[in-house]
């Protein structure tokens, strides 16, 4: 994320779609690195269709019409948006992303999508107008965290080649040169790479391809729907509003600290992720826990995954 920001956003007008704490990270990177101060942030909000549930209101992204209008007004060089926001379980639909792309391209800018938490919900960069897609070996790919993955179309590559990064180690243009050398059968050096981790990642990609990428995508949605159904049966409310619920990261409300911190689940032998703030103006009482449904092991054993979770949840709630 920082490599992309330092290469493409330095002293530029930027617009950020912030749906939670991990898209707040764009703001942290821009401020800490003094990359640009010309930034517009559009935050998630309580959905119009959210019924009266006290403090447990469901969130949705800024309306796409508002985002498009802001892009047309501010004319950003870069729009940063999260496909899936890990803190909220919010996922941007394909059509939402396409409209972002169309809008930013109409003013000469680039669309950068953070797909680190997408799981196996693959995005078609060309069809959706994504210029830069960021991912990582962990989570959906089920591999060892060791590097950042930056995929770029021709427009993004052209912009990288005509800009200068403000970092040595995270110089995206330099790493693009390194990658090209390897693609052409050569070798180049900029910094020592995590070779073992990268080879493990290569093997995991091959494993996923052998299973079938479309099959994994379908499995991701099926698993997410079944886990959400279990939660709904226990009257546990999703933070993400209907239509924006990610199948790979499910975030739900709780009033119990031991569930919020994950300790209640750990006592039943189940590891989950503790809740984190959204940084979108949510109330101080905001308290959640998060379920990461990543991993080839889960996607190839959906019924077993759902059964183990349901059994643990019932013991936690007993």
Where are each of the predicted segments found?
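Active-site C-terminal subdomain of aminotransferase-like
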Residues: 138-229, 297
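Internal helical hairpin/lid segments
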Residues: 12-16, 193-263
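Active-site phosphate-binding strand-loop segment of PLP-dependent enzymes
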Residues: 51-119, 132
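Conserved active-site segment immediately N-terminal to the catalytic lysine
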Residues: 126-138, 148
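Conserved beta-loop-alpha segment that forms the PLP phosphate-binding cup at the N-terminus of a helix
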Residues: 1-28
């Amino acid at each position: 994320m920082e490599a992309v920001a330092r290469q493409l956003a330095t002293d530029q007008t930027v617009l950020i779609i912030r749906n939670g704490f991990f898209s707040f990270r764009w703001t942290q990177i821009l401020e800490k690195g003094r990359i640009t101060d010309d930034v517009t942030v559009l935050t998630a909000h309580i959905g119009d269709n959210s019924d009266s549930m006290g403090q447990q209101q469901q969130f949705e992204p800024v309306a796409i019409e508002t985002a498009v209008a802001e892009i047309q007004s501010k004319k950003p060089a870069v729009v940063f948006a999260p496909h899936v926001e890990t803190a909220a379980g919010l996922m941007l639909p394909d059509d939402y992303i396409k409209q972002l792309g169309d809008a930013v391209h109409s003013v000469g800018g680039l669309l950068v999508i953070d797909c680190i938490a997408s799981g196996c919900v693959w995005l078609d960069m060309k069809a959706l107008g994504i210029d830069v897609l960021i991912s990582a070996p962990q989570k959906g790919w089920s591999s060892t965290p060791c590097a950042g993955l930056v995929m770029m179309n021709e427009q993004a590559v052209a912009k990288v080649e005509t800009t200068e990064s403000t970092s040595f180690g995270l110089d995206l243009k330099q790493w693009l040169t390194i990658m090209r050398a390897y693609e052409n059968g050569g070798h180049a050096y900029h910094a020592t790479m995590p070779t073992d981790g990268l080879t493990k990642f290569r093997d995991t990609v091959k494993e996923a391809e052998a299973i079938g990428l479309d099959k994994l995508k379908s499995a991701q949605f099926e698993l997410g729907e079944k886990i959400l159904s279990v939660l709904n049966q226990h009257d546990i409310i999703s933070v993400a509003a209907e239509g924006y619920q990610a199948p790979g990261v499910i975030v739900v409300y709780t009033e119990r600290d031991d569930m919020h911190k994950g300790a209640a689940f750990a006592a039943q032998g189940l590891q989950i992720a503790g809740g984190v703030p959204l940084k979108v103006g949510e109330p101080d009482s905001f308290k959640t826990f998060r379920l990461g449904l990543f991993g080839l092991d889960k996607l190839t054993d959906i019924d077993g995954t759902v059964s183990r979770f349901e059994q643990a949840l019932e013991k936690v709630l007993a």
